[in-house]
């Protein structure tokens, strides 16, 4: 079906009634890590949970880059109204030219990286568009669209807020799966709460999988290698090889049974 709010879509979607349609749903953070783009790349359609509850000092507004002393935070200052349930799509940027500090930190730490000049000008152009009164979500989505393009991630992306689907947690996820005709749902590995709601998905005819991703190691500024920085780190260091490197960390998705067993093992070892 045609869905409103399409941000990007160069991959052909399944058209037959019997074909499997795999989707993923996740909040669009600031300058996400490699695993976020791997999740997008594995599915037929990706729903950006832009109206989820905003959490202060979360990945919604910050991420990390590699510096000579380790991983360094870059945080977008926002107007936090403090009310329970403030949706991400309503959060506004607070400070003018906050991006100057971000760009300076990036330039200091990546200025000598092999592919710095290939990506920095476009990054700068995007960041400079946003200031007080602008929405954090618009900044995040602009960066995600650009980064996805550089990584050759072609999955169509849709803002969940445009779907008109209400509900909470798993119930809303199931409703969105049904709306777009999904047969399979690929979840971030961290969303283990879904293990308690598998029956809801099964009743809707949706099979649940969990992402299996091991951060790939590559030549990085300021050894030793540190994983889980923004995907900018990969692009600045490896350039056109970045997409292939990103996908090299992908494993066969976990089943709920495998995730439950792994979680039980972790709890037993504590």
Task: For the regions a language model picked out, list residue spans one by one.
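Residues lining hydrophobic/aromatic ligand-binding pockets adjacent to catalytic sites
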Residues: 3-270
